[in-house]
Amino acid sequence: MKRYFLFTVFCFMLTSCYVESPITLEKHFIEVDYNAQEIILNADEEILNINYVNTESDIDSDNAKKYGSQTAQIIENDWFKLILNRNSPYCVCVSLKENLSDKDRKLTVSVSRTIRKDKALIVQKKNPDPLK
């Protein structure tokens, strides 16, 4: 009888658990030209954290600085800046500097909640005339 009771309680706990649905970004692939620009990644749920997963560029991305406060989370390096405004946590601002190299730049941005994540790949095309 005791085992049956424990099994029933365990099953009830499983059925009453809240399962988080995954956060979803509006766009998962964004291709932009070489000019300096800002991109807004919109999400359907509140974003708790941002990160960049990887980058492929002529500039080393391992020198990224991460800092934050109660109002913003910021990640930046030589050619990009990610900003999550905690007062409006449904979007991430991605600021890209002009791509003066002869290679495309690729940046994967990850947004997350407690346990779920979503990613967007941003490709900044190379400068068609790198001598400019």
Map each language-model feature to its residues.
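Bacterial signal peptide processing site
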Residues: 18-21
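Post-signal peptide N-terminal segment of mature Sec-exported envelope proteins
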Residues: 26-43
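A short beta-strand micro-motif common to beta-rich folds, especially ectodomain repeats
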Residues: 101-115
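C-terminal edge beta-strand
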Residues: 29, 92, 115-132
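Sec-dependent signal peptide recognition
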Residues: 2-8
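Surface-exposed binding patches on compact interaction domains or structured appendages
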Residues: 38, 43-93
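C-terminal motif of bacterial Sec signal peptides marking the signal peptidase cleavage site
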Residues: 13-16
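Ligand-binding face of N-terminal immunoglobulin V-set domains in extracellular IgSF glycoproteins
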Residues: 89, 93-96, 106-110
